[in-house]
From Swiss-Prot:
Residues 1-7 are cytoplasmic. The keyword Cell membrane applies. Residues 29-165 are periplasmic. One of its GO terms (molecular function) is heme binding. It is a single-pass type II membrane protein. PANTHER family: CYTOCHROME C-TYPE BIOGENESIS PROTEIN CCME HOMOLOG, MITOCHONDRIAL (PTHR34128:SF2). It holds the Pfam family CcmE. Residues 144-165 have a biased composition (Low complexity). NCBIfam families: PRK13254.1-1, PRK13254.1-5. This is Cytochrome c-type biogenesis protein CcmE. Residues 139-165 are annotated as: Disordered. One of its GO terms (biological process) is cytochrome complex assembly. The chain crosses the membrane at residues 8-28.
Amino acid sequence: MTRNRKRLAVIAGGMGFILTAVLLVMFAFSQSVAYFYMPADLAKTPVAPETRIRLGGLVGEGSVVRGTGSTVEFAVTDGSTNPVKVKYTGILPDLFRGGQGVVTEDMFAAGTNVFVADTVLAKHDETYMPKDVADRLKSQGLWKEGQGQEAQGKQAQGQEVKATP
């Protein structure tokens, strides 16, 4: 083998290795990415059953029904006419209650309109919510300022206060 052929073989092997690595990373990301939806989004563009997504909004007031064991059913709403029924088995976060912001993650059960969640995250303010989602909830009048957070103008815990002379 000549020197040029060896160099070409090394370059081709390196390119093949890089291509394989990129394809493996893309496959891994496609398996772990979960797109964020709100109930109004799901009404416009339904998601195929068994597609992993994140569903966010507010827990419907009076919709929390505790079943046997640690199974809980509740509705997630964003003010649209179609709240989404969610079923979750596990320990709920302390901040979870009706009217509170929530993000659930998993998929719709095949043949039903029930979202079976394996993760439930309770939110107490827009710090943990995408800005556009918080803005949509505020524009619909569903977001209550100061809910779960210190009122504006109060000094946050841990911040230094500078005295003015």
